[in-house]
Structure formats: C-alpha cells, structure tokens
Amino acid sequence: MSTFVAGGNVSANGIRQHYLRYGGKGHALILVPGITSPAITWGFVAERLGHYFDTYVLDVRGRGLSSSGPDLDYGTDACAADIPAFAAALGLDSYHLLGHSMGARFAIRAAAQGAPGLQRLVLVDPPVSGPGRRAYPSKLPWYVDSIRQATVGMSGDDMRAFCATWSDEQLALRAEWLHTCYEPAIVRAFDDFHEVDIHQYLPAVRQPALLMVAGRGGVIEPRDIAEMRELKPDIQVAYVDNAGHMIPWDDLDGFFAAFGDFLDHPLV
C-alpha cells in the first residue's frame, strides 16, 4: 500500500516551495534531493520512508514545481535558508533532515546557520569539492546537455545515454521531469560545488550527523572522511559499498541498511 499522502505548496523564505508528503505520521523528516532531482524522482525512496516518518520531499528552488526563473538567488546560502523556512511554514517544530549530494551540502549549511527544531542530519554522499580541492567528478555538460534535450522533449530511451544503469521506470520519470530544472540554477549549484567550501561549516553543526558514503561514487575518499571527522568528531560514517553516487538507484536495500539505528530504529 502506498504511503503517499499529498503534494502541496507553501510560501516560505520569499518563494513558493513545493513538496510531496509521505506517511503522514511519526517524527517529521525533510528530504532535500540533489542537483537535478525534482522531488517526484525520489518517490520510490520516500514511499519506504513513509512507513517510519512523516516525510516531506522538497522541490529545491529552480526545480520541479517550486519557484523558478531569472529573479531568484540559487546560491548555497539562499537554498539552505529555504529548509528551516519550509519547516517553520508547516509548523514542524522537530524534524530530521536527509540530504543527498547538493541537498546534503544545503543541509550542512542550514544546520550551521541555525535551524530551529532540527534534530539529526543524514548526509548522503555530499560533494567535497571547493576552493583548492579536487573537482567534483561529474562534469557540467552532463547536466546541461540532458536538461536541454529534456526541454525539447526526450524519452526514457533517450535518457539512457545519461543514466545507463537505471530502470525503464526511473529513466522515463527523469525524462518527464528534468525539463523543470532551470539551467541557471543548475549551473550556479555546480559552480558552488567548487567555489563554496562546505567543510568550513561543519564545526558549527551541533546536531548528530550520519555521513553515508557511496563505495563506487568517486565523490568521497578516505582522506575526506578523515578531514570531516577532524571538523566534527562525533560524525558517524556508513558505507554502501556497491553503489555509485545515486545510492538508492543502485542499491536501495543497502541505502536503508546504512541508516542503522541512527534515526532511532532500523529502516529495514
């Protein structure tokens, strides 16, 4: 039985924020996807999270059905500030925060800025690039080329050239929704991967945090984990050995197993 409750919109931090809600009961959990992942593409993950949490999946500004266009700020600080504003708009006075990739960077920044009610963070394979650091392994044309094709119109089969290991259903959904990713927002986020050093904010994160590392992602290396442990000594680390950067797409069971009991009870 589906745990999907409803979609909705709230006005928060000066923009329209669209979300999908799953579960509807239990402790609140906000899920912030990655750079070109509208909320609906995380539905297969949220369906399972909905068995355990009152789950809200965000369309980050410039993506999906949230506010978009040339007049918005798509920088890290603005996107991070959207998260506690969203929680406040919905009256979520206690919640966990799960971020993947770009969303994990925003989660770190939001926690460091101060996020009332935030209890625990799950940081799924966040890019660790930044000034003076090695580049993020994915390249900007991979994103831009696929967005431009989706804007014209593309099929799931067309999308296979960009995501060769995905299922037909996953490819079709991405092909359907990728055109909602506003190209300047994506470019700004990608640039911030290299221009904003997210490590600087870790010492200000007071909440317990779990770092989930993709074993085949090429994003986080042992030296990165060591540095993050120096900056936040209590950070927990879990590995999904057989997954690439898009962990749930490669190993959904491994993704949920990696939570352990960090969120108070196992998710398997």
UniProtKB/Swiss-Prot annotation:
Q: Which residues form the active site?
A: 101 (charge relay system), 221 (charge relay system), 245 (charge relay system)
What top-level class of enzyme does the UniProt entry assign? hydrolase
Name the GO cellular-component terms.
Answer: membrane
**Per the record, what is the consequence of mutating residue 221 to A?**
Retains 70% of deformylase activity
**Example of a GO biological process term:** nicotinate catabolic process
The job of this chain, per UniProt, is described as: Deformylase that catalyzes the conversion of N-formylmaleamic acid to maleamate in the aerobic nicotinate degradation pathway.
**Protein name according to UniProt:** N-formylmaleamate deformylase
Q: Which organism is it from?
A: Pseudomonas putida (strain ATCC 47054 / DSM 6125 / CFBP 8728 / NCIMB 11950 / KT2440)
Top-down, what is the taxonomic lineage of the species of origin?
Bacteria, Pseudomonadati, Pseudomonadota, Gammaproteobacteria, Pseudomonadales
